[in-house]
Amino acid sequence: MNKQIQTEADELGFFGEYGGQYVPETLMPAIIELKKAYKEAKADPEFQRELEYYLSEYVGRATPLTYAASYTESLGGAKIYLKREDLNHTGAHKINNALGQALLAKRMGKKKLVAETGAGQHGVASATVAALFDMELVVFMGSEDIKRQQLNVFRMELLGAKVVAVEEGQGTLSDAVNKALQYWVSHVDDTHYLLGSALGPDPFPTIVRDFQSVIGKEIKSQILKKEGRLPDAIVACIGGGSNAIGTFYPFIKDDVALYGVEAAGQGEDTDKHALAIGKGSPGVLHGTKMYLIQDEGGQVQLAHSISAGLDYPGIGPEHSYYHDIGRVTFENASDTQAMNALINFTKHEGIIPAIESAHALSYVERLAPTMSKEDIIVVTISGRGDKDMETIRQYMAERGLAND
């Protein structure tokens, strides 16, 4: 295994050629302030203790690493373990990062938060920590996403957040990020931008990765306890890439195959997909250089996925770098493949995963049978499927897949 891999951003915020700080001059003071504050917090044992206290007492960590006996048997290959991020408070991995950044904002003396959300999971996690720490929160959410995720909008409002509909562009996550960045520029004195994925200008990709790395660190100690060795393969779904980078990061220098599963939407041969790595090319969006779905003229294209949490047109800079050096292998799953995996997995394990997580399971169903019964796969179940019930119900009804 190549030990020369760059695992931290350089002083300009780049991983290889990806990352950086492509932001208006007016935002640089805030970025510099954040970078300095984060560096200090990271080195402060008291900050780490406080973070660990809330992760344990409030979020409910550590989450289990569950052996999926029935699912393993049905696939007839490698042993499959599930990293249960669906069991966190609020039902997904998003809370790990929201909590960490809220503590950081509090430390910086910021009384207000602004966030973007797509599926609403990051919005709910942000609203949750804002309520916990008595902070104001404005959430920008695309008007299309608001229609798809009414329940999460209500949850955010119940928790005390103000949800602002974004009509511009296609009314999805990408447009919400634009609005949140604009808002931050004009409220920078008292507001922290609680970015939800491992992207945006440096130091955000590093901050989000560090707060999500609790996933991979736990996997490592748990699998060593259960199996006495590291897994052969680790699989996670990828939108912007925060659950995946948190899962992969502690294993980057180990001899473990890492698979990120992108959303192929209606198929990689259509223009309705979210394959930033699979069909994209490097470009700049939302303050960072990364792989993007764009046309020849560099216009960012609309990403599509049945899962609102994966339809982002980019993938974070660290993933972009790991792709280029061949450290992480990027696979994909279509809407249909993900939904079929979701239905199959649920029947075997009695766990209803988020549609995002089902993309990872779809690849596990292809990978496991090619491996031996001694091999070990860990797959991150990034969230639970409660938010997706209506989508799943519609999908099954349209295809006559009612329960027999």
Curated annotation (Swiss-Prot):
Q: Which UniProt keywords apply?
A: Amino-acid biosynthesis, Aromatic amino acid biosynthesis, Lyase, Pyridoxal phosphate, Tryptophan biosynthesis
Lineage, top-rank taxon, reads Bacteria
UniProt EC number: 4.2.1.20
Please state the span of the N-terminal signal peptide per the UniProt entry.
none
The UniProt entry, under SUPFAM superfamilies, shows: Tryptophan synthase beta subunit-like PLP-dependent enzymes
Q: Does the keyword Amino-acid biosynthesis apply?
A: yes
Is Amino-acid biosynthesis one of the keywords UniProt gives this record?
Answer: yes
**Reaction catalyzed:** (1S,2R)-1-C-(indol-3-yl)glycerol 3-phosphate + L-serine = D-glyceraldehyde 3-phosphate + L-tryptophan + H2O
Q: Which cofactor does it need?
A: pyridoxal 5'-phosphate
Q: Which residues carry this modification: N6-(pyridoxal phosphate)lysine?
A: K94
Family membership = Belongs to the TrpB family.
Its quaternary organisation is:
Tetramer of two alpha and two beta chains.
- Name this protein carries in UniProt: Tryptophan synthase beta chain
What lineage, starting at the top, does this entry show?
Answer: Bacteria, Bacillati, Bacillota, Bacilli, Bacillales
